[in-house]
Amino acid sequence: MLGAKASDIPWNNDRRKNMLFNVYGDNAIYQWAAMLLVLVGLILLNEVARRTKVGGLIIFGAVPAVLTVYFIVVAVAARMGVEWAVNNQTHIYMNGWFHYAKLYAALTGCIGFMMIKYEWGIGKKHWFKAFPFAIVAINILIAVASDFESAINGWYSWWLSSEGVWLYGGWHNVFNGIAGILNIFCMTGWWAVYSSKDKKDMIWPDMIWVYIIVYDIWNFAYTYNCLPTHSWFCGVALLLAPTIAALIWNKGGWIMNRANTLCIWCMFAQVFPLFQETFHDGTTFYPWATITTQYADGTVSGIVAGTSANANPTAMTIVSLMALIVNIIALTYIIVKSVKNKKNPYTGEVFTNFKYYQAAKDRAVVK
């Protein structure tokens, strides 16, 4: 075994099959360091955005305005055949409908949540309290559509997305798509949304750790299924950042944390996709680029559209089934408790007897 490559060692191959990501070998230190750097960066930028009005306006006002002009210029120039635009990394790797839809849906959420937090304009109106539910549901449906798209385009076979990523469809997409739809109805207390007493957060008291966990499992499964070359960052670091904040120091503010960090990450990834990209020929621009174990041999080389060679859907199936099961359990609990208490879970609240709910409600200005 002396001098053998990591991929040549039998126990290393077995370990690969039992892991979610290919995070071992020569690049492991870069992969873990980059993921932790993204995690810390998202937490810090979220704190800047939520704690200061100026920070929020810059991050979710000025920066997106500049980037929107940039995206339009790139798209128009690329269509005209201008060389710099045709070869621009945003145009090459992030030109699919999903990434733009996710970015601007998240941005819409951030702006709407700030309106509620600071009581700007319609943010003071009672009917607008249902906006957080609506925008989160839209974001979830965007991902659900992407899951079903993958199942349709490659039923237990490889297909190449418009961003040049090899995806493998199947029942895992169906399971997780259904889980996403159920997850929408796991959101309760739609109109019980408030500004925090310190004006740093929008508080949704009934969105406690129960929803946070089932959402995170579902969304992780989505990124694992449909963003396999990005999931190490957008399925691990991006989900951990708002959850850590909401469980430790920002109780009740998870959904605002989530929107903020999602929008920040989407803007960064749209401009610098090469940061995390693994190309369809198996090469990477940076050593920390990480892929999932759906690529059986740890590479994406030699994959052919319409075939199943080099595919390992086991982990995708397990995490997608887990997402479906936990969302069924959560929704069942909500229904049973609502029937028992004779209360509508959407116009009323469900988790009022939980400590997390009480801690969140104590932070809110309830009018």
Each predicted region: which residue ranges?
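C-terminal transmembrane-bundle signature of multipass membrane proteins
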Residues: 39-44, 234-366
